[in-house]
């Protein structure tokens, strides 16, 4: 179905016909490619399957797509690499604010197989120096946001600390007056989805500045 929010051209949501939770796995990649084979002029992606870095609804498997080219799709590969056993697949790190791997090739089965290898490797990856932990206290942190365009894999980590209880790799508290909601698939690809409250707050802020009012005296403006 087409989204009522229409964040971009022909913004659509594809639902799993069976009520099942969000889960990033090999079958996810198969579904993505099945869709873009039917609709080659569309992209299709899946939000991650963990809190904070995932979508707002994790209880039902779904995808988002559309007839639109996001900034991430235009971003170049800054470093190419080859995965052993997949020399026939082009792979590279995308020049993007998030950790993005782009893989491409003519054989979708090979792309699916490599995506599954990358997912499995990332699920268990830990780099303490970079504060990346596969899991802490039994809670898993690593997942990916896959996007197919006839493919980018965005590496995500949802670890939290006392200093950043909503996520280390999430907007920090000093930015929550702008946005504290999940950073999902659409934002990952370069389109900012800001909360509706900002529209009224920005107009209120404009009037307060023009009037020379004390911003700290107004609760809705003091954080700005």
Label for each model-derived stretch:
Residues 1-224:
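HIT superfamily nucleotide-processing domains
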């Amino acid at each position: 179905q087409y989204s009522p929010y229409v964040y971009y051209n022909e913004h659509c949501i594809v639902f799993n016909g069976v009520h099942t939770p969000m889960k990033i796995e090999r079958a996810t990649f198969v579904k993505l490619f099945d869709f873009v084979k039917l609709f080659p002029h569309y992209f299709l992606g899946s939000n991650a399957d963990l809190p904070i870095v995932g979508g707002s609804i994790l209880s039902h498997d779904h995808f988002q797509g559309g007839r639109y080219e996001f900034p991430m799709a235009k971003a170049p590969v800054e470093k190419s690499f080859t995965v052993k056993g997949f020399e026939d697949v082009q792979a590279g790190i995308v020049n993007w604010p998030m950790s993005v791997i782009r893989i491409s090739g003519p054989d979708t089965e090979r792309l699916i197989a490599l995506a599954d290898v990358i997912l499995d490797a990332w699920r268990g990856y830990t780099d303490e120096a970079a504060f990346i932990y596969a899991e802490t206290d039994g809670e898993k942190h690593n997942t990916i946001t896959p996007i197919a365009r006839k493919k980018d894999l965005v590496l995500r980590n949802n670890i939290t600390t006392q200093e950043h209880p909503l996520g280390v790799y999430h907007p920090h508290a000093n930015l929550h007056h702008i946005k504290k909601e999940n950073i999902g698939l659409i934002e990952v690809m370069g389109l900012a989805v800001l909360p509706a409250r900002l529209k009224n707050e920005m107009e209120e802020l404009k009037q307060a500045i023009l009037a020379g009012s004390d911003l700290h005296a107004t609760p809705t403006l003091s954080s700005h």
